[in-house]
Amino acid sequence: MVVMINGSFGVGKTTIARLLRSSLPGSIIFDPEWFGFILNRINLKRSESWDYQDLVLWRRSTVAGVRLFSLFAHGAVIVPIAFSNREYFDEVVTAIRNLDPGLRVFCLRASLATVKKRLVERGTKIEGPGSEWIARRIIECEEAHGDAYFGEPVDTENYSARQVADEIMRRITK
């Protein structure tokens, strides 16, 4: 089983993924962001974009990573990810669904104010020089995640991480 946790930066994807891993025996987390960091580090960018999701290599590697992790997991593969581009989302989700027709995609949601507050609390700079990219991305995610296109909506606004993880567990085990 593959469980994709979509949502904006700061909405709690990694925290929820860790809680799900502890609730799903044999599960592992595959975070495609790690590969994105590698691509940024080795500077494979072929455009002005600073978003590794713009790279076909990243999108195909995300699918390949899910496939490989699925071979070695003794439970679910949990994939925290921040999609707001429908084309990229469709490309990756369709390919993963071809590997695992039971793919579950959830989209964590919180207000822009809450997301900003959480990012600041964890030490992420969201205003001023050097923060333009993340400021733009959290707004893009907020706007894109207003409907269920990017996954089954899960409200995180007034809920603890444990409550959110429990809600996702309830949905995938019913």
Across the structure, where does each feature detected by a protein language model lie?
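Conserved substrate/cofactor phosphate-moiety recognition/catalytic segment
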Residues: 18-63
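P-loop (Walker A) phosphate-binding loop of NTP-binding proteins
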Residues: 8
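Small-molecule kinase domains that catalyze NTP-dependent phosphoryl transfer to phosphate-bearing small molecules
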Residues: 121-167
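Hydrophobic anchor at the beta1->P-loop junction of P-loop NTPases
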Residues: 5
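ATP-binding Walker
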Residues: 11
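Walker A/P-loop
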Residues: 14
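Glycine-rich phosphate-binding loop used to anchor ATP phosphates in small-molecule kinases
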Residues: 54-103
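Conserved phosphate-donor/acceptor-positioning beta-strand/loop module used by diverse small-molecule
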Residues: 99-119
